[in-house]
A protein has these predicted regions:
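Bacterial Sec-dependent N-terminal signal peptides
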Residues: 1-30
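Low-complexity, acidic/polar, glycine-enriched regions of mature
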Residues: 26-195
Length: 195
């Protein structure tokens, strides 16, 4: 009887271990393009402008236990520079030139650490993070606050980031022989779904 009880305990321990490993592996996820949006918002001496990312990719590895976000093991995200589209050919050409798109194909973010996780409501979290942002071959460590929603097998990351283009050796684009000048700072507004 004792031997049977010990065997049952070993079996239960093995089952719990196996199921927790399976749960963690099941959390690897990729960007769902159809459910994601990233817009770059900028200014000029004439009018405000915006550019939308039409191609994005990336992977995330959140740790979710019982539907609760316990941490983010890894997160990366990339935007294809040549798929940044404003709908204005001249502006798009100037943007690609400024970002040196022939040499640097992607803008890339990679999570370095999560400093603080706050539960804001059921299945919603605020993450204070640091990550490496690479634009036009220049990498800078940035602070980024993510609002994260856990929705079944999906994790949805949203937020805004202010970027000074000159810190990445980018000359703000000009148009009409310099008559239209864009501001050096842009806001990146994003909502990216991983599944």
């Amino acid at each position: 009887m004792k031997k049977l009880k010990i065997n049952q305990n070993i079996f239960l321990a093995f089952l719990l271990l196996f199921s927790s490993i399976y749960t963690l592996k099941a959390q690897d996820s990729k960007v769902v393009l159809s459910e994601s949006k990233l817009t770059v918002l900028g200014t000029s001496n004439v009018h405000d402008w915006e550019i939308e990312a039409k191609a994005m990719s990336g992977k995330s590895h959140p740790t979710i236990v019982g539907g609760v976000l316990k941490g983010i093991k890894s997160l990366d995200f990339a935007v294809e520079v040549e798929q940044l589209v404003s709908g204005r050919k001249g502006m798009d050409a100037n943007t690609l030139k400024a970002l040196k798109s022939k040499t640097y194909k992607n803008i890339h973010f990679k999570l370095v650490n999560v400093a603080k996780t706050t539960i804001t409501s059921t299945n919603n979290y605020s993450l204070e993070t640091q990550g490496d942002l690479t634009v036009s071959g220049v990498t800078k460590r940035i602070n980024q606050i993510f609002l994260v929603k856990v929705q079944g097998s999906k994790t949805i990351f949203s937020g805004k980031t202010k970027i000074d283009m000159t810190q990445y050796n980018i000359k703000p684009p000009k148009a009409l022989m310099g008559a239209i000048k864009t501001g050096a700072a842009v806001i990146v507004d994003f909502k990216v779904t991983y599944n």
